[in-house]
Regions:
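A short acidic/small-residue loop/turn micro-motif
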Residues: 30-33, 79, 148-151
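Hydrophobic alpha-helical segments and helix pairs
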Residues: 107-150
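A charged helix-plus-loop insertion that forms the helical arch/lid used to bind
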Residues: 69-82
Length: 306
């Protein structure tokens, strides 16, 4: 049994993953605000399961050296800087530990067991506190070196005088969106909850209001959010020969969101046949928010020959 842990900007989720990659005993705790509390929380989670597990698999945002289990920068969690996560937990609990980027974990789970199976080039966009990206080919993650063979070569259509300004505008929009974190699902739900006058952020209530067409302002906010994600997808497609993109994170359970992103993506394509590539499929991760846990466990198993 593997203890899989998904470190997010809002919650730390965890569960037990068996040899058939089924998850049980899932739970979550709020992500601590300090490094000391972070260590205490992780150690409590592991201690509670230590007697029944053979290893620890961790999905974490940011820049990760997976071989060493070292976090260079933990995404939007400010205190996760230069953290030897794997070695410290191994030293404390005498258990093998593997750490992988959370979006890579989601993409790996979908490539091996879910919606990105049997593709030469697929991507997972994980929408949470921030936005994560994982690229896969068949059952494997694409490394910075291997990804170069999937770069899209310029076509005559894409180099046309009408296409180039649009592509530049698209690129700059996407860059600003990433810098400002406009793709954040947590940010969208927070803004939408405030718009509805809710006492606290409530994703299900937000989407119920969207589906019930309760507020024109909310509809516009939702349309803008879907447009931001569609721009990210189209930007990715302009660089890589993608066959499919899946949307991950807890928000991916909302069918209305996937439909909204797909509609916005089709709208971007409608008047731009000169882009030089065809539309691709956008759908939810098969395992939704569990993709991170399953992918981390799968990475642990493959690295330890289990």
């Amino acid at each position: 049994m593997i203890l899989a842990i998904d470190i997010g900007g809002t919650f730390i989720k965890f569960g037990l993953v068996d040899d058939d990659f089924k998850i049980s005993n899932q739970s979550k705790v709020p992500t601590p605000t300090t490094l000391d509390d972070f260590w205490l929380t992780l150690e409590h989670i592991v201690s509670s399961h230590k007697d029944i597990i053979s290893g620890i698999a961790i999905a974490c945002p940011g820049e990760i050296n997976s071989k060493r289990g070292f976090i260079f920068k933990g995404g939007l969690i400010p205190y996760l800087m230069a953290i030897p996560l794997g070695s410290r937990l191994t030293r404390t609990f005498q258990l093998p530990v593997k750490v992988i980027n959370d979006a890579d974990a989601a993409a790996l789970a979908e490539a091996r067991y879910g919606s990105l199976q049997d593709l030469d080039c697929g991507a997972a966009l994980v929408l949470g506190t921030g936005v994560g990206l994982g690229l896969v080919s068949q059952e494997f993650l694409l490394s910075p070196l291997s990804v170069t063979q999937y770069l899209r070569a310029p076509s005559p259509q894409s180099m046309s005088q009408t296409s180039l300004p649009f592509q530049w505008e698209l690129f700059m929009h996407g860059l600003v969106s990433l810098v400002d974190n406009k793709g954040s699902a947590v940010g969208f739900v927070h803004e939408a909850s405030q718009l509805l006058g809710l006492n606290q952020d409530d994703g299900p209530a937000v989407f119920s209001a969207i589906e019930g067409n309760q507020s024109e302002d909310l509809n516009l906010l939702f349309k803008d959010y879907c447009h931001e994600i569609a721009v990210l997808v189209l930007n990715l497609q302009s660089f890589f020969r993608l066959e499919k993109v899946v949307i991950g994170g807890g928000i991916s359970r909302q069918g209305t969101l996937i439909e909204g992103i797909s509609d916005a993506y089709e709208e971007l394509f409608k008047d731009k046949p000169e882009l030089g590539f065809e539309p691709i499929t956008i759908q939810a991760c098969h395992f939704h928010n569990d993709s991170n846990l399953l992918g981390a466990a799968s990475y642990f198993a493959s690295e330890n020959d289990l």
